[in-house]
């Protein structure tokens, strides 16, 4: 298994997709809305991906809830992370967050999808890229809700990915469109944004982490996703994290400062990433596969899902029915809240 995660073109694999998936550097596939028509088609696409690859790949998606939910029709309408604490008492917020983590993960596992890149652990809502994807502006509240969400994901059989280390919440720029810079003192980032990552690592609740394509100017001129300081010195050595480190998508503008696609891939792997995402740019992905030295990434097998239930079994279960009802209701309440309704 190799360290490259990439995407496929449409609802089913074409000849080029199949050729790419056989490459020994490929270790994963990430799915997008363009890959989804309905649940039966999605399940068949995942089957095709499994059949086309030499080894079992890590199949992933961003199914956070709120505005980041790639699969909608036939799946529960998941609330944005902010909704849990914003609209409920603390005990109810924690209960619903646990059910939200379980439901999201269980619905994906029933499609034979290994991981959804969640939860978002960024603090605060002012960032254009993050906004309602953050659990809360208070680090302690965000930690409590995140722990419940993680407990739910783990109980379904899915590994969790905390993002975007060391924290994307304080920058207004969107790293999909530009390279954001965070000029705050390191002490502030450590005391505020990093607190949640540190606590969850100490409690061994994070299986993987995705760093931010953000330059923290007081620490390193490189984005955190390509920074040995953040990934090796801080995350591995200081915090003792021994899980998987993903790069965020190397096609994002936030990664462009690291050079060409092969240069970005090399920089992120050398900085300490275990798996690199190259999405929505097939030419860039192929150039990485053509130019990257052979790398094995067998540790990625830790990310395979542990569920063994079918979609029918899930939808017939009492827990799914109750969770679906509660989370759909919370999504509707959150939308009404954003629209200014009582």
UniProtKB/Swiss-Prot annotation:
What EC numbers are recorded for this enzyme?
A: 3.2.1.52
Gene Ontology terms for molecular function: beta-N-acetylhexosaminidase activity
Name the domain of life.
Bacteria
- UniProt keyword list: Cell cycle, Cell division, Cell shape, Cell wall biogenesis/degradation, Cytoplasm, Glycosidase, Hydrolase, Peptidoglycan synthesis
Protein species of origin: Pectobacterium carotovorum subsp. carotovorum (strain PC1)
PROSITE patterns to which the protein is assigned, alphabetical? GLYCOSYL_HYDROL_F3 (PS00775)
Pfam families linked: Glyco_hydro_3
Q: What is this protein called?
A: Beta-hexosaminidase
What protein family does this chain belong to? Belongs to the glycosyl hydrolase 3 family. NagZ subfamily.
What positions does the entry give for substrate binding?
A: 62, 70, 133, 163-164
Q: Which gene encodes it?
A: nagZ
Alphabetical GO biological process terms: carbohydrate metabolic process; cell division; cell wall organization; peptidoglycan biosynthetic process; peptidoglycan turnover; regulation of cell shape
Q: Where is the active site?
A: 176 (proton donor/acceptor), 248 (nucleophile)
């Amino acid at each position: 298994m190799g360290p490259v995660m990439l995407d496929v073109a449409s609802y089913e694999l074409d000849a080029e997709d199949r050729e790419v998936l056989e490459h020994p550097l490929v270790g994963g596939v990430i799915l997008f809305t363009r890959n989804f028509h309905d649940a039966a088609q999605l399940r068949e696409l995942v089957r095709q991906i499994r059949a086309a690859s030499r080894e079992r790949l890590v199949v992933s998606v961003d199914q956070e809830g709120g505005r980041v939910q790639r699969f909608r029709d036939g799946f529960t309408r998941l609330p944005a992370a902010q909704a849990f604490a914003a609209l409920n008492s603390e005990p109810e917020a924690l209960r619903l967050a646990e059910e939200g983590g379980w439901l999201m993960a269980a619905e994906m596992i029933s499609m034979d999808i290994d991981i959804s890149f969640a939860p978002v652990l960024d603090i605060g809502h002012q960032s254009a890229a993050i906004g309602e994807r953050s659990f809360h502006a208070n680090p302690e509240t965000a930690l409590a809700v995140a722990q419940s969400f993680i407990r739910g994901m783990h109980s379904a059989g899915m590994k969790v990915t905390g993002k975007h280390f060391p924290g994307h919440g304080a920058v207004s720029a969107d790293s999909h469109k530009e390279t954001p810079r965070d000029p705050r003192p390191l002490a502030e980032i450590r005391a505020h944004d990093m607190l949640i990552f540190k606590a969850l690592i100490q409690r061994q609740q994070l299986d993987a982490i995705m760093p931010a394509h953000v330059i923290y100017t007081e620490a390193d001129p490189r984005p955190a996703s390509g920074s040995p300081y953040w990934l090796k010195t801080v995350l591995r050595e200081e915090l003792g994290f021994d899980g998987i480190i993903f790069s965020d998508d190397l096609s994002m503008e936030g990664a462009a400062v690291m050079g060409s696609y092969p240069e970005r891939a090399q920089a992120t792997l050398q900085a300490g990433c275990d798996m690199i995402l190259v999405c929505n740019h097939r030419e860039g992905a192929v150039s990485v596969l053509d130019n990257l030295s052979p790398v094995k990434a067998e540790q990625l097998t830790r990310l395979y899902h542990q569920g063994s239930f079918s979609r029918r079994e899930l939808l017939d279960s009492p827990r799914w029915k109750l969770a679906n009802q509660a989370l759909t209701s919370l999504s509707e309440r959150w939308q009404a809240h954003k629209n200014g309704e009582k």
